[in-house]
UniProtKB/Swiss-Prot annotation:
Compartment list: Cell inner membrane
Keyword terms: Cell inner membrane, Cell membrane, Membrane, Transmembrane, Transmembrane helix, Virulence
Stated name of the protein: Protein MgtC
Record membrane topology: Multi-pass membrane protein
Organism for this UniProt entry: Salmonella typhimurium (strain LT2 / SGSC1412 / ATCC 700720)
Length: 231
């Protein structure tokens, strides 16, 4: 009977971690992200297990294990971050996993009220701030600081894939933002026109010269056109 009484707080802490982690994961699952309900629940529960085990063996230094959890969860978070061209996906999901580990630490320490409050705040960040971020992304770019440019290059259709990768490397080297990349058949038969939408500083001359000079080194490109987007 005494052993069961000793086990009750342990189980309660783990259940609280699992439930709060699952609550955070439910939002990720609803948005069909890679790390969803089960992953966040397991991360929170695992963090609570480490804290509880450290309190059993070294009750005076649970903070040391918490620090190890913070660094260790980074490897798991890195697994959900993916790069697609110039875009990076999975940062929010990785950050959510990190937060779930924090919830597990609080539950392992028995700080249920703090864990619940943190869970609510994390959910608000993922749900309410999502719309705010989308609205901010739709705001027009300052005309004084940045401008939009259109870069068009013409190449043989067999070389399109290589030229696209060449353009991506040049844009990265020039430290300019790529907003869009597409291609259409050129006026000459057998050729493609690749169109890149760029965003950069209003003083574009140095950037333009760098990009055009680098593109000019590619023998597969037959024509280059640079213009300011008037939209």
């Amino acid at each position: 009977m005494e052993e069961r009484m000793l086990m009750f707080p342990y189980i309660l802490n783990l259940l609280a971690a699992m439930l709060l982690g699952a609550l955070i994961g439910a939002e990720r699952q609803w948005r069909q992200r890679m790390a969803g309900l089960r992953t966040n629940a397991l991360v929170a529960t695992g963090a609570a297990v480490f804290i509880l085990s450290s309190m059993t063996t070294s009750p005076d230094s649970p903070g040391r294990i918490a620090a190890q959890i913070v660094s260790g969860i980074g490897f798991l978070g890195a697994g959900v971050i993916m790069r697609e061209g110039m875009n990076v996906r999975g940062l929010n999901t990785a950050a959510t996993l990190w937060c779930s580990a924090g919830i597990g630490v609080l539950c392992g320490l028995g700080q249920f009220k703090n864990a619940l409050a943190a869970t609510i705040i994390i959910l608000c960040a993922n749900i309410l701030l999502r719309e705010a971020a989308q609205r901010i992304n739709q705001l027009p770019i300052s005309a004084e600081g940045e401008k939009r440019y259109i870069l068009k290059v013409t190449c043989n259709k067999e070389d399109e894939s290589a030229v696209r990768q060449w353009l991506l490397n040049i844009v990265k080297e020039a430290a300019i933002c790529l907003q869009g990349l597409g291609s259409v058949p050129a006026q000459e038969q057998g050729y493609k026109e690749i169109r890149a939408e760029l965003v950069g500083h209003a003083d574009y001359r140095k950037t333009r010269e760098l990009i055009i000079s680098r593109i000019g080194d590619n023998d597969n490109i037959t024509a280059i056109h640079w213009s300011i987007d008037s939209q």
